[in-house]
Amino acid sequence: MWENYGMTFIEYIFLKKYRNEKNHVAIFGNKNLLIPIEENKPVIFISGHFANFELMSMEITKRNINLATIYRPLNNFFLNPLMEYLRKKYICKNQIKKGISGVRDAIEYIKKGYSVALMIDQRVSEGENIFLFGKPALTTTLPAQLAIKYNLKIIPVSIERKMNEKFEIVFDKEINPQNFRNKIELSQKLNEILENMIKKNPHQWIWTHDRWKQ
């Protein structure tokens, strides 16, 4: 994990290069990626902190999909402004800070026709206990709530670092919120999808905290 973490940090230097080039990423599930354009309706993109996770949102915006991303500011007071600058300039200009105000911002973006991307693998103290690998884990239910309230499809996205500075990004089959009874049931489905991502690529999951802390 730490090797991948270090490589991801170094790669912030090359975000401009990644923004302007195409041959470093292979995209699978392009049909799913383009659902917001084909259906002229926002979606919720969900993923976890794998490989260089920043490239997922970058590739979405490179397809001219209107996107806003929800992020957690870094604890480092000095480094955080630089990271925010780089994200807005090269990844996605619409950055939403995690929190109550961020939820309101996400809703406003959705009403304007923007898709929303967020990570679901971090512990959220105000979240619900949703099972992850058989153990209850405080988990955000925001993607489920937004999907149910606004009838938005959820698109799982995963990324894997390959050899020679190459990446593979997979946009998986959409999830219809109408197939679930409530936010808990839908959130459990999302955690199961996250489990499969982790099982497939455990060494590239950036996991630096106690995910199951209560």
Task: Describe the role of every protein-language-model region.
Residues N20-N23, S47-H49, A68-Y71, A106-I110, ...:
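Short acidic/polar alpha-helix capping motifs at helix-coil junctions
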